[in-house]
């Protein structure tokens, strides 16, 4: 029986119901419910449907003139009536996605302490390191199945935001529900408050976090370890998503925990999965395979290298040797292209550094090879930006790339929009409409020579909700590399451009539920094949996905005796 059709029995009544966002219906409580739950007189006389409530809320939403105010308004609805919030967002998903998440959520993080209104999620501060179990038990969410956790050190392209980073887990989990059908009752945002090195926050009298420089080293490692163990004790089957950890911690934490717990890092693995999925769709539209491409990255941090490793894995699966695949991937950071003789390369960068012997015949060969030099010598067919540095995909670089590649694939993925390496408008004009473009933040369509080009947003929201749904439906105990690769291929299968030869590189957000279910099935199938979940038939797996898919509809309430 569908949960939305089954009555929910509540052991409390009166104003407490109206203060519980997971339960509150506002003006939609029926006459019978108002009598049984002592709500008569606490609400206006008229009984409304959820659509009538959503219509009023949307009218109010449209009265706000700036995006941050719209974000705050929607968060207020979320904190009072979550079912209405998700119905409203789902009714206007394309319009509201940039408001509830990037780019607007970045501003909300910067102003988190100043605009703080109501508690949501858990804040686990380092001074309370010995009481983590008690803190987890204080959560109002008892059946947690998905956790998004951050320490606030690398929030989007904005750097250290301390506890202001809580806006990211809240926003990410909103997308798990809006896009992936995960019940909000199963979600929990968590911020690990380990201090901040942001002097503006330390000096701000309104800052609500632990006013202390960030801990590091062994103290930090032991604190995160205590957190992970406590979460596993409290919710042993929960999926944990690491979010916006600094480069120095992101990869080590992922390597430490990915084989111990059901977890993944969205900045590294989610970004890689959606990028590979988008590239597979772009390659199909261009009539090629990924293994035939030469790829240049601007940005060689954990996110960029994570994408590069996923690309290498996909190229190998298409039939070329790993050594050859690595020769076709060129990583550029602030010091130039990564080369094997460079000192101080991080472990995850070393495998992606080019062998100096292979590039000695390049023009302008030196210790510091610029992005333009890489474009002129390596002649890449794909250019990916994850640098967080705006404007570095210059007209000279894009035109140099286009001179040797008829249909260049250009992905300036940095967030927010103020950090993008080049705008889609510039890229398409510089290439006379020939480039295949996807961005990390939303952009309006671009018109070149009377042709309108839809700009795909290479947003992780196409991937992680489906991964979460697949993990829940299958009961998977791990998130493996093969499961992530399956999500990429499933996303590519949904591309309008690769299917029809026209339209956007990625599906419309209005189709996100269908896309998430398709990805969930692919992810769950691989989880079963690898032994991370119990075997089941395709039919039962599809049914499990449907059964786990929550919709924003009010349930009937019955009162228990008390």
From Swiss-Prot:
Its cofactor is Mg(2+); Mn(2+). One of its GO terms (biological process) is malate metabolic process. Keywords: Metal-binding, NAD, Oxidoreductase. InterPro entries: Aminoacid_DH-like_N_sf, Malic_enzyme_CS, Malic_N_dom, Malic_N_dom_sf, Malic_NAD-bd, Malic_OxRdtase, NAD(P)-bd_dom_sf, NAD_malic_enz_proteobac. Divalent metal cations. Prefers magnesium or manganese. It comes from the Bacteria. Signal peptide: none annotated. It catalyses: (S)-malate + NAD(+) = pyruvate + CO2 + NADH; oxaloacetate + H(+) = pyruvate + CO2. A divalent metal cation binds at residues 243-244, 267. GO terms for cellular component: cytosol. NAD(+) binds at residues 154, 267, 415. PROSITE patterns: MALIC_ENZYMES. GO terms for molecular function: malate dehydrogenase (decarboxylating) (NAD+) activity; metal ion binding; NAD binding; oxaloacetate decarboxylase activity. Homotetramer. This is NAD-dependent malic enzyme. It comes from Shewanella piezotolerans (strain WP3 / JCM 13877).
């Amino acid at each position: 029986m569908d949960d939305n059709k089954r009555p929910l029995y509540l052991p409390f009544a009166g104003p407490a119901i109206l203060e519980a966002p997971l339960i509150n219906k506002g003006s939609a409580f029926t006459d019978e419910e108002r009598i049984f739950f002592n709500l008569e007189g606490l609400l206006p006389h008229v009984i409304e449907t959820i659509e009538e409530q959503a219509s009023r809320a949307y009218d109010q939403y449209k009265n706000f003139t700036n995006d941050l105010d719209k974000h705050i308004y929607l968060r207020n609805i979320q904190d009072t009536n979550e079912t209405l919030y998700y119905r409203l967002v789902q009714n206007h998903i394309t319009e509201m996605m940039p408001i509830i998440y990037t780019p607007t959520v970045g501003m909300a993080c910067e102003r988190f302490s100043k605009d703080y209104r109501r508690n949501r999620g858990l804040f686990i501060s380092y001074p309370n390191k010995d009481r983590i179990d008690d803190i987890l038990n204080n959560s109002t969410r008892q059946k947690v199945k998905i956790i998004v956790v951050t320490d606030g050190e690398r929030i989007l392209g904005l750097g250290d935001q301390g506890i202001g980073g809580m806006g990211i887990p809240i926003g990410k989990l909103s997308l798990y529900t809006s896009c992936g059908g995960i019940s909000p009752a199963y979600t929990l945002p968590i911020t690990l408050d380990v201090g901040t090195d942001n002097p503006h926050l330390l000096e701000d009298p309104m800052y609500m976090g632990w006013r202390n420089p960030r801990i590091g080293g062994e103290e930090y490692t032991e604190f995160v370890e205590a957190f992970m163990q406590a979460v596993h004790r409290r919710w042993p089957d929960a999926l944990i998503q690491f979010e916006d950890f600094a480069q120095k911690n992101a990869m080590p934490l992922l390597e430490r925990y990915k084989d111990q717990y059901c977890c993944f890092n969205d900045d590294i693995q989610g970004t890689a999965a959606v990028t590979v999925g988008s590239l597979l769709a772009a390659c199909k539209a261009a009539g090629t395979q990924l293994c035939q491409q030469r790829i240049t990255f601007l940005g060689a941090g954990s996110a960029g290298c994570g994408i590069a490793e996923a690309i290498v894995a996909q190229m190998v699966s298409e039939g070329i040797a790993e050594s050859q695949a690595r020769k076709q991937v060129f990583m550029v950071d602030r010091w130039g292209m990564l080369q094997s003789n460079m000192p101080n390369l991080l472990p995850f960068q070393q495998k992606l550094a080019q062998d100096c012997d292979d590039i000695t015949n390049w023009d302008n060969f030196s210790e510091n090879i610029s992005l333009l030099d890489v474009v002129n010598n390596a002649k890449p067919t794909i250019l990916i930006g994850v640098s967080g540095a705006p404007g570095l995909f210059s007209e000279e670089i894009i035109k140099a790339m286009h001179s040797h590649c008829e249909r260049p694939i250009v992905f300036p993925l940095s967030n927010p929009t103020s950090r993008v390496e080049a705008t889609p408008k510039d890229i398409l004009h510089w290439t006379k409409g020939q480039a295949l473009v996807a961005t990390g933040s939303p952009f309006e369509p671009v018109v070149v020579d009377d042709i309108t080009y839809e700009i795909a947003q290479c947003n992780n929201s196409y991937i992680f909700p489906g991964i979460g749904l697949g993990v829940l439906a299958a009961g998977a105990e791990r998130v493996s590399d093969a499961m992530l690769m399956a999500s990429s291929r499933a996303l590519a299968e949904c591309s309008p451009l690769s299917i029809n030869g026209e339209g956007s590189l990625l599906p419309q957000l209005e189709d996100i539920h269908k896309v998430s279910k398709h990805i969930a099935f692919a992810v769950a199938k691989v989880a079963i094949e690898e032994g991370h979940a119990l075997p089941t038939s395709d039919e039962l797996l599809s049914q499990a996905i449907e059964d786990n898919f929550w919709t924003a509809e009010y349930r009937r309430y019955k009162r228990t005796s008390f």
